[in-house]
């Protein structure tokens, strides 16, 4: 306990790209073509073997990929698996504005959106790791720290709340909406 939690890459990118691929026509009515093309161009930025190499050489005690269910599910799974608590700040979680805007169209929560390629890293040297990753052009931010016990606290807008057991990935809601429209 007491180690820093570093978020590497952006949350929700994989989900955003899948939404663009599957709902491109609906998004084309709301956004300029350049906006959607810019997002498609980011596909190559999702994965970073370099981040894993840097982590391996910089005292990372645990790594947890962020996949289905987004960062909230990953934080829960990581804490549950390690038997630890955590305290994290929502505003420090790196999410691209494009992801927020695409999520707003479909009323989705970007924090519960699949985030393949993003990783949580736990280390006693969070600032060092963050700076090394950033020097390599890899987005990284210290979002919180591990704690004794098993309280999982999320701070947002000055309010303290407890992390809930993971909900289904937000992409499932898009599929449900489509089924309801086609029913």
Where are these regions (language model features)?
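Short beta-strand segments
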Residues: 6-10, 114, 122, 144
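Short acidic, glycine/serine/threonine-rich loops at helix termini
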Residues: 11, 16-21, 74-76, 152-156
């Amino acid at each position: 306990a007491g180690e820093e939690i570093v978020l590497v890459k952006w949350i929700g990118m994989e989900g955003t790209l899948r939404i663009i691929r599957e709902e491109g026509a609906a998004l084309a009515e709301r956004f300029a073509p350049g906006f959607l093309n810019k997002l498609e161009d980011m596909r190559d930025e999702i994965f970073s073997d370099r981040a894993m190499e840097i982590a391996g050489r910089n005292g990372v005690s645990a790594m947890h990929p962020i996949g289905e269910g987004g960062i909230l599910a990953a934080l829960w799974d990581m804490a549950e698996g390690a038997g630890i608590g955590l305290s994290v700040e929502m505003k420090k979680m790196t999410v691209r504005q494009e992801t927020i805007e695409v999520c707003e169209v479909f009323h989705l929560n970007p924090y519960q959106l699949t985030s393949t390629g993003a990783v949580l890293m736990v280390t006693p040297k969070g600032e060092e790791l963050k700076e090394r990753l950033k020097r390599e052009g890899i987005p990284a931010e210290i979002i919180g720290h591990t704690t004794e016990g098993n309280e999982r606290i999320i701070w947002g807008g000055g309010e303290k709340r407890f992390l809930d057991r993971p909900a289904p990935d937000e992409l499932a809601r898009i599929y449900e909406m489509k089924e309801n429209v086609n029913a």
